[in-house]
Amino acid sequence: MSDKPVFSTAAAMDPAASIASSNKVLSNTYWLLGLTLAFSALTATISVAINMPPMMALVLMIVGFVLLFVVHKMADSAKGLPAIFAFTGVWGASIGPMLSVYLAMDNGPTMVLQALGGTALVFFSLSAYALNTKRDFSYLGGFLLTGLIVAVVAMIANIFLAIPALSLTLSAVIVMIMAGLILFDTSRIIHGGETNYIRATVGLYLNIFNLFIHLLHLIAVFTGGDD
């Protein structure tokens, strides 16, 4: 199989052709995003059903990080498609033990459904806003990256500090950062900043994945399920 960048669409000089190219990338991205999210949901469900041990979930998360680099390396070839499904499937399975904990709580299934619904509402609302306004949100990039780095460092520190209030604050901050990244990544596709729909899918998938996890944490805390 040739490594020709068949999954990228270069922007043309003609504005009309450039718009058509961006629309094609966006359409392909949404199709692939829907399929990978469905596959993640399937592997997460299987993980919950077999009661996957937390240690195995940690191993899968590490494997997922490795596969993330593989996806980016192979995104310009046909190998990128099986790579992205491997990545999203592994990451979906890795949250099985976490979901099992939430599902075992009072109103656990309701909380998970609320988090899913909230994630969908945020994603579709922000995507629609970016698509309808055609605003360029590239200016958010530096701010969002800085905020994400600070949040990750604080999360690592809180593993040892174990401060509940900090954990809650970080989840709220990450929800806002992911919302901003949805605007940023969608805007990049619209304006031709991202022409590879596999890479575009990975970006939006990660935004949705993290948005769901931290929204679920917030819902559990505010409904008394996660003290």
Predicted features by range, described:
Residues 1-227:
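A hydrophobic alpha-helical transmembrane-helix feature that marks the membrane cores
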